[in-house]
Structures are given as structure tokens and as C-alpha cells.
A protein has these predicted regions:
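Glycosyltransferase catalytic domains, chiefly GT-A lineage
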Residues: 1-157
Length: 157
């Protein structure tokens, strides 16, 4: 968790190993923003329920864990079409109390439910009143002038 690893810093950017940064775009976005969190919009889904469906159909995780998590977020009242981000780039003001809570709860959810971290993260943003649609930028796969995204290996969960 970045607030534990980097307490001396105010903010951090997590970037998946399969992404190369090709420009100053991301850094300029961060400099110009007052948000405590930002991530790219998901390349395909804008609804967490559609992503659950896709993850189940592609068998990307344990079916029981996915269904248990899906039931949990439904019971909590997670709305449809709230927005959905991709966790391949995460900007966080990681010492912010709300972000600390999200990160700690995220660890608990990934430890106890599906390992597909985008699912639980989107729920936790909603639960902690971070508007996904206001906190996302164009997907990195679509910004070929700013990012190069390598494909994941087939059969990887």
C-alpha cells in the first residue's frame, strides 16, 4: 500500500509493467488536477456488472469467488452504469484518508473475493463517494501518442 511504503511522499502513480509512457501527457494531467485519484476509463465496459459478466464468461477467476463478490456489491446497492476504470494506471494522493481507506479495503476484498482487482476497486470508489466518471481519463490503449500498451500473455489469469 503506497501510504505505508511511501509515507514521505504525497502522491504516487502505479503503472502496469505492460505500459510504456511515450509523452508528458500523464504527468501534465496530474499537475493540472486537484483530484485525489485518477485512472483511465475501461477500454470496453462502463458498467461493473458487464465486467463481472465478461470475467465470468472468460473464466478469468474462480466462479464462486466472482459470484460471491457480485452478490456482495448488489446487496450493498452498487448502481449499474456508474462508470468503470482500468487499473493499469492509478494516480493517488495516497496519504488522503479516503484513499487510505479504499486501499486497505481493496486489499481485504482481493484477499477474500475475486482476484480481478478492477471489480472490487470500482465498488470501493463508489462506496467512498469518488465519482469514477469525473476521475477517469481516456483509456491508455486509445492514446497511441501517449502510451504503448503491450498485450498480456494468453491464458493468464
Amino acid at each position: 500500500m503506497p501510504h505505508k511504503i511511501f509515507p514521505q511522499y504525497e502522491e504516487s502513480i502505479y503503472i502496469d509493467a505492460n505500459i510504456n509512457i511515450l509523452s508528458e501527457y500523464l504527468f501534465n494531467l496530474v499537475k493540472q488536477s486537484d483530484k485525489v485519484f485518477m485512472q483511465p476509463r475501461h477500454f470496453k465496459n462502463m458498467c461493473i456488472y458487464k465486467e463481472y459478466e465478461d470475467v465470468l464468461n472468460a473464466m478469468l477467476d474462480d466462479k464462486k469467488l466472482i459470484l460471491d463478490e457480485l452478490e456482495f456489491i448488489k446487496e450493498a446497492g452498487m448502481p449499474k452504469n456508474y462508470g468503470f476504470g482500468e487499473n493499469n494506471i492509478l494516480y493517488r494522493k495516497h496519504n488522503d484518508e479516503k484513499i487510505i481507506k479504499i486501499n486497505e479495503d481493496w486489499w481485504e476484498m482481493v484477499s477474500n473475493y475475486a482476484k480481478r482487482d478492477q471489480l472490487s476497486f470500482a465498488y470501493l470508489l463508489w462506496k467512498n463517494k469518488i465519482n469514477i466518471k469525473d476521475s477517469t481519463f481516456e483509456n491508455s490503449r486509445l492514446q497511441i501518442e501517449n502510451f504503448y500498451v503491450f498485450g498480456h500473455k494468453k491464458g493468464r489469469k
